[in-house]
């Protein structure tokens, strides 16, 4: 909702794939825009990319988390590689990765998930979109 409304918005954010410059700057830009647009926004940061979304490893970000990171390389959330071709393959515990990510998304009542990642990350983002999740995907490469 626009400024002045009382509804809480929850937006998820993750960085995936290889680490590179500008991830922090991009996250900061997205967060800054969200904080300007909405009075009551909560940004949920997933640790280590899709892995954090799969295993519900997250933290509620504060505005101060995005301060001082503009010129810092890498990502304050961490990143990991989760091969797209294995997203539908259960892990060693039998966990269906896509179902686990959907479960976390809905459990946390996210309105949208912002994904910063390369080619494989974009394929996974599209897979989640096909599953009905609201995705904003920002491509990057090393």
What does each model-found stretch correspond to?
Residues 1-8, 98-103:
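A short, basic/flexible loop-to-alpha-helix module at the beginning of a structural domain
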Residues 4-57:
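N-terminal phosphate-binding or glycine-rich loops at protein starts, especially the Walker A/P-loop
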Residues 10-20, 76-78, 111-115:
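Short glycine-rich or small-residue beta-strand-to-loop segments that form or flank ligand, phosphate
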Residues 13, 43-46, 78-79, 115-117, ...:
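General beta-strand structural signal in soluble alpha/beta enzymes
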Residues 17, 47-53, 81-83, 118-120, ...:
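Acidic, glycine-rich active-site loops and adjacent beta-strand->loop/helix elements
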């Amino acid at each position: 909702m626009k400024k002045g409304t009382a509804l809480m918005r929850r937006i998820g954010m993750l960085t995936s794939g290889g680490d590179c410059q500008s991830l922090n700057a991009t996250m900061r830009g997205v967060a800054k825009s969200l904080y300007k647009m909405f009075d009551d926004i909560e940004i949920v940061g997933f640790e280590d990319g899709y892995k954090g979304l799969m295993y519900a490893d997250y933290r509620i970000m504060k505005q101060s988390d995005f301060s001082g990171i503009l010129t810092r390389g890498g990502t304050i959330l961490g990143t990991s590689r989760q091969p797209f071709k294995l997203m539908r393959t259960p892990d060693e515990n039998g966990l269906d990765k896509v179902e686990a990510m959907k479960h976390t998304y809905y459990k946390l009542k996210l309105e949208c998930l912002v994904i910063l990642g390369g080619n494989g990350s974009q394929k996974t983002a599209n897979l989640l979109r096909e599953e009905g999740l609201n995705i904003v995907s920002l491509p990057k490469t090393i």
